[in-house]
Amino acid sequence: MKDIGQQLYTTHLNGGHNSLTMSPKQPDANGAPRPNRQEAQTLLYQGSEAEAAMMTIATCAKCKSVHKISLQDLQKGTGKDGMYVCFQCSLGAAPPNFHFVSNNSSATHVGNKTENFSSSVNSKFKVRNFKPGKYYCDKCRFSTKDPLQYKKHTLQHEEIKFICSHCSYISYTKGEFQRHLVKHTGIFPYQCEYCDYGAIRNDYIVKHTKRVHERAGAKRPVKAVAKLEPKRTGTSKQNPELLKASNPRTTFQNKWSDQLSGFSLHANKDKMHNIMLLPEPKEYQKDVVCIPNKMTLSEPNEVNLFENKNVEVEVLSPAKEPVQPGMPLTVVAPAELVVPANCLAQLIDVKVVNGTQQLVLKLFPLEENNCLEAGRDNGGNSERMVKEKGSNEQEKVLSAEKTKSLTVDGNVGKLVGIDSFQPSVQKQLKNVKWVRSYDFIMPNSSVHNNGKSFINSETIEDFQKKNNLYPHRTAFPSVALKGHSLASVFKNSVLRSLGAASNPFPYKAAVCFAESGRNLHSSSQQLLPFAASPATCSFSGEKGLLPVSENDLESTSKVNIPVKVVSSNRKQEDNQTEEHKAVSTVGQISSQHKSEYLHINITGEDRSQQPGDKPLELKNSERTNNTNDGPVISSVFSLSSGSENVPEGIKWNSSTSKIKSIELLRRKIAQLIESCGKPSSLASNSAHRRSVGQASKGTSKATSEGIQEINVSLTGLGHSTGTLQKPPNDGGITGNRQLTHQQIYPHFADGSNRKTKSRVARKAHVATPVLIPKGAVLRVLNSSENAHIIEATCEAPVSIPCSERQLIKPVPFCPVRQADSDLQPLRSERGPIDMSPNIETPLRPKLRKESAVCSTIHRKTGLLYGQQGSSELNKQGRLLSRSLSISRNKTKQVHLSRKKNKIQAEPSRCLKDPSIFQVARQLRLIAAKPDQLIKCPRRNQPVIVLNHPDVDSPEVTNVMKVINKYKGNVLKVVLSERTRCQLGIRRHHVRLTYQNAEEASQIKRQMMLKMKLKKVHKNNYQVVDSLPDDSSQCVFKCWFCGRLYEDQEEWMSHGQRHLIEATRDWDVLSSKGK
């Protein structure tokens, strides 16, 4: 029958006669397979041309059966509409259902008689919606009305065939051939990366992923397993037994967490490495490769440090069946069990020793793109070997009790005690370079529902011993964290953030420090710059050690806080003489994530930061559990161009923090405003910002040489940051994180001036008179009343982002000596406050340099007694001014100050009512939908500024009025500098203002249009419509989205856009209907 069918179709093609309807696709029941090689076209029909000219194929219009008939019979058998009707249907009897499908596969044609041709075609190619007049291919789903196209298509099938090598089945399409091969091999050509689902087409995998593995529109696997799929050919050739479990994954589960924390264990053919455990949440961490300079452990005593070790684990899955080789395991393991994130662990064998199950695991490093290029020293030529024992295979033995409590035995790379590292080990470890670094960030705010810390603080204190910890040359970055609410500890110097399952992790996490022989005081703070690559890290805790990198990759979407690490290329000869010592400022800042993160200011190792770097900020976020209150804004645009200005989301999230003293805060802000316009206070402010951080034992008697040394280094540095060496005896850092004046200056002069004198000529144009050291303490003396220091009562201390284009990099030194018990600095426990100048774009571009002066004005502190301290302050200010090389900056500073004073004068009048300071809200934008796109507006695109109800305050009203005065030069709309200074608003992320008690009751005015701007230039906006004067006028509500407008025209134009969008395709529909 197959030959007959081919003859019939070929007859039609060669005969050139077009039948009225071709047969529907009904491929062979006998099923011809197909191979993956091309063959020459074969002419299967060997009849005469005369017969081909006389015979053709026709399809019955009623029963859809295919018949081979002559042209004469075709002309006779056509019905009323020119359709061919077969003999049985023409009799008027009820046609049988598909009577052409005959069980007899040997139907033949004798002579010129026409018989029912049962095209034994595969049922998968049956045409569901058969339409007369179309040609249907019986080998695939192709159909066309053009007979020439149909002829070309059928010829392609004769040329391209796929023959199965197992059974000689002939297929004509690749998809059918792959479907057939699954019967023989059992392996699908496409695999789901999150589960064992396989398919013959990739679009099936895409649909499966969307249907099964996506939650709330965000693509993430059900199990947070970072899957690194190995090459299937490599594993099957090297280890045939691995095919028993093609997707082995072992997840170490935390039974206190809601989700599994995935550690992918995959197979490969490469040789074995013994690398520390790197937990890898898929969405937030990147692969890390440690590349030593081809050094191995050579001495016998070094090898003894890394010994086999039994680790007891609890098997969770499989629970009801015995553990067998090749099956996936889910175990709860302590921190001692280390499996690299870029390695695969395959269960090879199960042994029983003394009634205990021992599972033999085989480790394979993956061959995929985990091996990045080595650092500058290696040039990408070094091998991926970390503490390798020299054997091609290393085995880990999991031994379990009869109660499913397993232990792991193997070359785990155990570090036998924190103080057991000998200098020989350190010499080997110091050459390890990091070519890539993790992003440690808590994945989602919704995960931190318990509000607890990862690891108990008791566990942390066990590892924070006052021993010689070596945090500098370990194979992994080390972090020591301490604090009552501390959450994060590095297991083997890697934060065990457990991916999405970031609930408290009760197991022990040994913090292994292996470098730099430096004493770690439990209450003192030290910073580790070690050889790390660009990283943006966020850690839990208030104090600690952080890696430092050459570049500051500030991610605006996921990474909360940029932690920049300064890495060095030069080798350290001696552990005790390293200059990776810096003094950092620690502050608690309300960050945008609902877990606690750590930001540290670091300078290190006589290495200036790159021009693009920013000083680091140490921040500690507040935990907020209420993420749903506040209106949802469907479209919010940033009012300045650039990728860093893209808003995080479009939903306001408010976390309320009470201010202890409303009146004192109001007076403090008023004093800051008053001092903005005094030119004489500018120099004293700059000098005082330095002297505050250096004041010791109740006086601020900084010598002129010291001040000049600082100013020279700061002025010459430009964007670079000088290093601050630490005395060898660690005397500079005390329990309260205070530095004496005598310890700072000599090392400061040595550490920074020698590196920056060469930069003075190139970077001099960057320096400005606004020199504010990173971390200077804000102390405002309420001069009208008693002389006690006002404590910063807001939970978020002052932290102002810095703009490198307008301001030079200040050196982050600043811990201040607490001398008088009556003077309350800002939370000694939290450390001094970050006071880097905030250069946001004010109303005129030239005013950008002045904004920091108006925002962070330091009044004389209680450390300076009366007029004597004030005069000393002025002396220091004069010395500071002399040290600045560019004299014209001073006159420009005074000129800009007067302009700024005029602009700030009007907003300052709105601070009479203390009720507006009752509640400070932290406003953050969150996307209402996971797939919502937020982007900056394009040029000439009208921008509508929508404000949260809490922003509807006299403060914002006056700011808008001031902006309206400068219609041609609006760079962006922000709150006033003093508000950002006092409440620590992070640029581009948080909107923070005061809520008036009266406006809080007006809930119906949740979404109020404040101003409409038009983008007239790349960085400029023009005010199209100003603020309505009468706030009590009628409010119009949008019918579509519920947005409220005070202006009727705006409300109408807004609704018109909705109407246009809703009826965009109506004209197409109406034309089709006609």
UniProtKB/Swiss-Prot annotation:
Cellular component aspect of the GO annotation: nucleus
Main location: nucleus
Name of the molecule in the record: Zinc finger protein 518B
A GO molecular function held by the record: DNA binding
UniProt similarity note: Belongs to the krueppel C2H2-type zinc-finger protein family.
Zinc fingers, C2H2-type class: 162-184, 190-213, 1036-1058
Alphabetized UniProt keyword annotations: Chromatin regulator, DNA-binding, Isopeptide bond, Metal-binding, Nucleus, Repeat, Transcription, Transcription regulation, Ubl conjugation, Zinc, Zinc-finger
Sites of the Glycyl lysine isopeptide (Lys-Gly) (interchain with G-Cter in SUMO2) crosslink: K482, K491, K558, K594, K809, K846, K860
Compositional bias segments (type: Basic and acidic residues): 570-582, 604-622
Function: Through its association with the EHMT1-EHMT2/G9A and PRC2/EED-EZH2 histone methyltransferase complexes may function in gene silencing, regulating repressive post-translational methylation of histone tails at promoters of target genes.
GO biological process, one term: regulation of transcription by RNA polymerase II
Stretches with biased composition (Polar residues): 12-24, 693-704
The UniProt record lists the keyword Iron: no
Record flagged with keyword Zinc-finger: yes
Span list, region Disordered: 12-36, 568-590, 603-632, 678-704
Localization per Swiss-Prot or TrEMBL: Nucleus
Source organism of the structure: Homo sapiens (Human)
